[in-house]
């Protein structure tokens, strides 16, 4: 629908709001969570999943034509053209290691500072973050 337009870029607004922050963060809209017991027993599978997830994100960025057709085929959106138009504004990214920890801890701190209940009343310690084998 050509009459639709973007009125607010949330990623840009977040970045602008973070310019003066003590700990800069990025807008985080999706994470992978793994139980510590599962990670200890199946770390190789977790690393394989993360590597394939990173490759999927790279593919989506590098080949939006094919990615949008797959998005339509999976029923995520009804038309590939809609997916292709939307992809550049989705801020799809893969972060791991220290980059992920910095971005996510800053994001959680920004939420906590506004309303501690939004993070369960506390900020997670270093054990919360998996900064293992996958690197981007």
Model-derived features with residue positions:
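Pocket-lining segment of extracytoplasmic ligand-binding domains
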Residues: 1-70
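An extracytoplasmic/periplasmic, membrane-proximal ligand-sensing/linker region
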Residues: 65-136
């Amino acid at each position: 629908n050509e009459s639709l337009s973007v009125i607010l870029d949330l990623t840009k607004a977040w970045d602008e709001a973070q310019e003066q922050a003590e700990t800069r963060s990025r807008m985080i809209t999706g994470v992978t969570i793994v139980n510590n017991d599962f990670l200890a027993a199946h770390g190789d599978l977790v690393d394989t999943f993360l590597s394939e997830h990173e490759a999927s994100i790279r593919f989506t960025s590098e080949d939006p034509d094919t990615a949008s057709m797959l998005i339509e085929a999976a029923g995520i959106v009804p038309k590939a053209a809609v997916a292709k138009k939307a992809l550049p504004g989705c801020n799809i990214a893969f972060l791991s290691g220290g980059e992920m920890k910095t971005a996510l801890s800053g994001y959680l701190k920004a939420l906590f500072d506004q309303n501690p209940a939004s993070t369960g009343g506390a900020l997670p310690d270093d054990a919360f973050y998996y900064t293992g084998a996958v690197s981007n």
